Amino acid sequence: MSAPCAIWSQVNAADQRHICIVTETYPPEVNGVAMTLAHLVAGLRTQGHAVSVVRPRRQSSDSRSDHCDPEVTLVRGLPIPGYEGVHVGLPAGRVLQGCWLQHRPDMVYVATEGPLGWSAVRTAQRLRIPVFSGFHTNFHSYSKHYRLGWLQPLIFSYLRRFHQRTTGTLVPSVDLRDRLQAVGLNNVSVLGRGVDCQLFTPARRCAALRHTWGVSDRDLAVLYVGRVAPEKNLGLAVAAYRAMQQGRGSFR
């Protein structure tokens, strides 16, 4: 991953930094944000940085965190209806302040914009800790897919206020950066998503698996990975596949 932005210059400015990531979703949950953060944490630790994570307690099997674990702190959360396994974090200003006074991070990265994230931004600012935010999900755009389009201006107004309070906002693509800047969001930088070339490599090509798909060595296998949901823009994926079929080659 690479990012020409303030947070990355601060991370690289010293031999080791303590970075605290505040998020409502994290492995073993399976979704894009959780996987992205897992790779970010692994990459930072590989570079010698200390990374701690604050996330909501998912279920009773999560061990209670009655003291400040320097790696993972569990806070109160509520399940999100219709989104199994994910909890929205409740405000946790006192818990965060206690943890950060005991193990003060050099910077805080707030990956999600819920009540937990809002309290993290306020607490970090009160303690004069640099705080950055991540814009991972277009929640304001999702509303129109669930007959709540009238809420879109209110949701985006909240998101804009949230991110404007932080030192900078990290987004996954240049396109999203440009769109956010066009609507008045400042200090937006790109934290690109890398590709694990050890995992995604032709060396892992499996003829037996392709045979079960009915795909020959000369054919191109087209795969969609993700939830089947309105906001995933599956129509575009289908249109892209149809366009590929009009070209040369065999696809499946």
Predicted regions and their residues:
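A short helix/loop element that forms part of the nucleotide-sugar donor recognition site in Leloir-type
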Residues: 201-215
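A structural motif in glycosyltransferase catalytic domains
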Residues: 37, 44, 222, 237-238
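Short N-terminal targeting/anchoring amphipathic segment
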Residues: 96-117, 127-134
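A short, charged, and often flexible helix/loop element on the N-terminal side
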Residues: 70-99, 147, 151
